[in-house]
């Protein structure tokens, strides 16, 4: 897919020319990430997971139009994670759109060991407590000691696993049955780790 890729953005050209070799450099450049191929090149070990496929219907003059809405998460299980949604009249294109959008929303999770029960100084957990919200859903992630695992609902667990966080407690409020909001709230909580407390 990336062999015949012709970059359209400045960041894409820098990556294609080999001037930017890592995802860290790409994000530090502050150039907008608008091409999923950039992520494919810089993070070849990226995995994706479809969290939800739902049907959305809309009434038009010609009748009822049905589309599929897909929510997907991507991550390399080593600090990078992104989430995205995609809509299309067929399932396969909707999945591809969601995965591409997730790649464009990728960021680096700041990992650490913020658990008072552990204090090993490793990067198996989070450096401090973080909270994220989306719609009615509020997710709080708390650093856990080594060996705890991910204590979270299924959707949040899949997002956290792909981010490469191994030990964490979580508390949720709101309609966690709404997969999109549950996933986005978890994503927003992880994003807060970028703003490290000094």
UniProtKB/Swiss-Prot annotation:
The keyword Ribonucleoprotein applies. GO terms for biological process: translation. GO terms for molecular function: rRNA binding; structural constituent of ribosome. The keyword Ribosomal protein applies. Residues 46-109 form the S5 DRBM domain. It comes from the Archaea. GO terms for cellular component: cytosolic small ribosomal subunit. Keywords: Ribonucleoprotein, Ribosomal protein, RNA-binding, rRNA-binding. The N-terminal domain interacts with the head of the 30S subunit; the C-terminal domain interacts with the body and contacts protein S4. The interaction surface between S4 and S5 is involved in control of translational fidelity. Belongs to the universal ribosomal protein uS5 family. With S4 and S12 plays an important role in translational accuracy. HAMAP family: Ribosomal_uS5_A. Part of the 30S ribosomal subunit. Contacts protein S4. This is Small ribosomal subunit protein uS5. The lineage of its organism: Archaea, Methanobacteriati, Methanobacteriota, Archaeoglobi, Archaeoglobales.
């Amino acid at each position: 897919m990336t062999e015949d890729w012709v970059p359209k953005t400045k960041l894409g050209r820098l990556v294609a020319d080999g001037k930017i070799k890592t995802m860290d450099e790409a994000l530090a450049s502050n150039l907008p990430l608008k091409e999923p191929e950039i992520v494919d090149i810089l993070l070849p070990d990226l995995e994706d997971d479809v969290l939800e496929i739902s049907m959305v219907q809309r009434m038009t003059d010609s009748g009822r139009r049905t589309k599929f809405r897909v929510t997907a998460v991507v991550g390399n299980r080593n600090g990078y994670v992104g989430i995205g949604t995609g809509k299309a009249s067929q399932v396969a294109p909707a999945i591809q759109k969601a995965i591409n959008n997730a790649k464009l929303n990728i960021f680096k999770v700041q990992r650490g060991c913020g658990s008072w029960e552990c204090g090993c100084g490793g990067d198996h957990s989070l450096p401090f407590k973080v909270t994220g919200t989306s719609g009615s859903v509020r997710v709080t992630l708390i650093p856990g000691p080594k060996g705890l695992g991910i204590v979270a609902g299924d959707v949040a667990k899949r997002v956290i696993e792909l981010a490469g966080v191994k030990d964490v407690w979580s508390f949720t409020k709101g309609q966690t049955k709404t997969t999109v909001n549950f996933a986005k709230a978890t994503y927003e909580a992880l994003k807060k780790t970028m703003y490290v407390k000094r």
